[in-house]
């Protein structure tokens, strides 16, 4: 267990920590161990076979690498043609789409309704929130939303945006490891 969210705060548990009802737990595990864990707690696991990612930055690149290694079909929507070329060369198994990811008609035409994972990774928090809310309305897939600013995390928690990724937390966690 890496962290526990409780009552709007984040706790890094120690050996004496006790989980409470309503705690949101973040943990780190291999895919096999995570699957085993979810089976033990009788939580159904629905493997993802395809993902639609909006935003083609560094997080999208590394996430796509991981997904492709796990045989997940990846489509990345990126509006910058030069970045699309870089992604296409770096991730030849992924489908790179040069389009404005906030174009709702385009997202629907790309199969948003049938995607099993929708990931909003643009550099604009508000756009990510709106994209995720749109995806939530049109898809039963898993949702992941990147949020850069931490100031509104209590408000965002009430919006049911799926898994929220805070790059600042990820950087801190990475630095603390060493």
Question: Where does each model-flagged region fall?
Answer:
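Cytosolic regulatory regions of ion transport systems
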Residues: 1-178
